[in-house]
């Protein structure tokens, strides 16, 4: 396949989203919509230009978190609004240039490869059951002959179900020669990229239609369409993992973000959320658990466990209502209702119900270090920083405020006190 330049249009405000967030930064599976257009474009080209305008600094800053090898230009929206105005002033590196939209997060590189057709313009089209609401594309003898907007279409033209999908490939020479000829003599006073199609037809150029998959070329203009697109994207992610051998219980209830990795003989149960750069290796994530930006290897989590960013679990059991954050646990059992944050716990250690690492003093976070074969009784608080050596027993109800040496018993508990007959005296005094 010959090299080509790619321009991605991402300048619009997206007013139908009804949001202060720029349209292309609304997220699907944890990443901005624009991320996906760029990701797929980079599979085809090393000359990527993203056209911005609305909140361009915010969009640029967000996208630069993911990509460093693309170009950004700011559209002269005041003088040259519209899709045609967006590509003005760009000089593509290669002889062909593909123009994509930043609000098509379902686009895939293998579909874009199909634009490799010998023509002045290759225009993506949809074959629909009903093209109501779309501009119609008139095709004769395999060539595009006309584009007509629905409001301008004749009765016969309205019967046509071939519609414009909104992505084009141009010969760069034609594009650069004809962009200066565009005008804004229309109701919106904008410069339209579709006018280049009319110019090419009038010049007798070859314009080829490319029938594309409607799902892949779905544009997102509202939050309803955003939700619809995310459902499709989620299904794609989960099917790829299941094909690779991952078991998923009721996959429609599972949410997996872009960037998550799942390897080996892993089981993901219903209601699970895997977020950020979570990595699951040979592990069982049980019902309604959340794993975010953490590594879980040869372990089980949940049900209703929460593994927060920076955790690393190896050969570990995390039970119901246990939360970890920045916790390195190796060969640990924490079965019930505990918070383990900013800690390192070694193999053979059992964490009793209600254990808390008190890691924050109101200003700074502090570490709790627990060694091997430590038994932590229920309702224990570790007031960090503390270091618990190997083979230690922590009595239930203890508040640990200092280091504990190997082999010791640590116990902080008030002496029990009983008062004979107190119940009867206490309540009888209230009955009058």
From Swiss-Prot:
Its EC number is 2.7.7.23, 2.3.1.157. The keyword Translocase does not apply. Binds 1 Mg(2+) ion per subunit. It is found in: Cytoplasm. Mg(2+) binds at residues 103, 221. In the N-terminal section; belongs to the N-acetylglucosamine-1-phosphate uridyltransferase family. In the C-terminal section; belongs to the transferase hexapeptide repeat family. Signal peptide: none annotated. GO terms for cellular component: cytoplasm; membrane. Its cofactor is Mg(2+). Residues 245-432 are annotated as: N-acetyltransferase. Residues 1-223 are annotated as: Pyrophosphorylase. GO terms for molecular function: glucosamine-1-phosphate N-acetyltransferase activity; magnesium ion binding; UDP-N-acetylglucosamine diphosphorylase activity. Pathway: Nucleotide-sugar biosynthesis; UDP-N-acetyl-alpha-D-glucosamine biosynthesis; N-acetyl-alpha-D-glucosamine 1-phosphate from alpha-D-glucosamine 6-phosphate (route II): step 2/2; Nucleotide-sugar biosynthesis; UDP-N-acetyl-alpha-D-glucosamine biosynthesis; UDP-N-acetyl-alpha-D-glucosamine from N-acetyl-alpha-D-glucosamine 1-phosphate: step 1/1; Bacterial outer membrane biogenesis; LPS lipid A biosynthesis. It comes from Aliarcobacter butzleri (strain RM4018). This is Bifunctional protein GlmU. The lineage of its organism: Bacteria, Pseudomonadati, Campylobacterota, Epsilonproteobacteria, Campylobacterales. Its main location: cytoplasm. GO terms for biological process: cell morphogenesis; cell wall organization; lipid A biosynthetic process; peptidoglycan biosynthetic process; regulation of cell shape; UDP-N-acetylglucosamine biosynthetic process.
């Amino acid at each position: 396949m010959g090299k080509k330049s790619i321009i991605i249009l991402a300048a619009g405000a997206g007013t139908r989203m009804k949001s202060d967030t720029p349209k292309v930064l609304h997220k699907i599976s944890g990443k901005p919509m624009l991320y996906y257009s760029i990701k797929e474009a980079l599979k085809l080209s090393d000359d990527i230009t993203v056209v911005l305008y609305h909140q361009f600094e915010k969009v640029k800053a967000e996208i630069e978190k993911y990509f460093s090898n693309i170009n950004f230009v700011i559209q002269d929206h005041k003088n040259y609004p519209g899709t045609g105005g967006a590509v003005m002033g760009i000089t593509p590196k290669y002889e062909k240039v593909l123009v994509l939209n930043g609000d098509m997060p379902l686009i895939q590189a293998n579909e874009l490869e199909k634009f490799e057709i010998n023509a002045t313009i290759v225009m993506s089209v949809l074959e629909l059951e009903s093209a109501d609401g779309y501009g119609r594309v008139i095709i004769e003898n395999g060539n595009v002959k006309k584009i007509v907007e629905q409001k301008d279409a004749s009765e016969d033209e309205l019967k046509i179900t071939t519609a414009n999908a909104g992505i084009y490939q141009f010969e760069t020479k034609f594009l650069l020669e004809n962009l200066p000829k565009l005008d804004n003599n229309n109701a919106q006073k904008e410069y339209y990229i579709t006018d280049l199609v009319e110019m090419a037809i009038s010049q007798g150029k070859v314009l080829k239609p490319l029938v594309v998959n409607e799902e892949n070329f779905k544009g997102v203009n509202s939050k309803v369409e955003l939700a619809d697109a995310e459902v499709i994207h989620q299904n794609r992610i989960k099917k790829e993992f299941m094909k690779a051998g991952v078991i998923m219980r009721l996959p429609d209830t599972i949410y997996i973000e872009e960037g998550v990795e799942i390897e080996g003989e892993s089981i993901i149960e219903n209601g699970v959320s895997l977020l950020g750069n979570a990595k699951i290796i040979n592990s069982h994530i049980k019902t309604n658990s959340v794993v975010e930006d953490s590594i879980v290897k040869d372990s089980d989590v949940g049900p209703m466990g929460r593994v927060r960013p920076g955790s690393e679990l190896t050969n570990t059991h995390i039970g119901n209502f246990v939360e970890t954050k920045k916790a390195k646990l190796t060969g640990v059992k924490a079965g019930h209702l505990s918070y383990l944050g900013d800690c390192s716990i070694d193999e053979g250690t059992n964490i009793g119900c209600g254990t808390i690492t008190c890691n924050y003093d109101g200003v700074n976070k502090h570490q709790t270090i627990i060694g091997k074969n430590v038994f932590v009784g229920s309702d224990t608080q570790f007031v960090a920083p503390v270091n618990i050596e190997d083979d230690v027993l922590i009595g239930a109800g203890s508040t640990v405020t200092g280091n504990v040496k190997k082999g010791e018993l640590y116990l902080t508990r008030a002496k029990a006190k009983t008062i004979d007959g107190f119940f009867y005296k206490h309540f009888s005094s209230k009955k009058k």
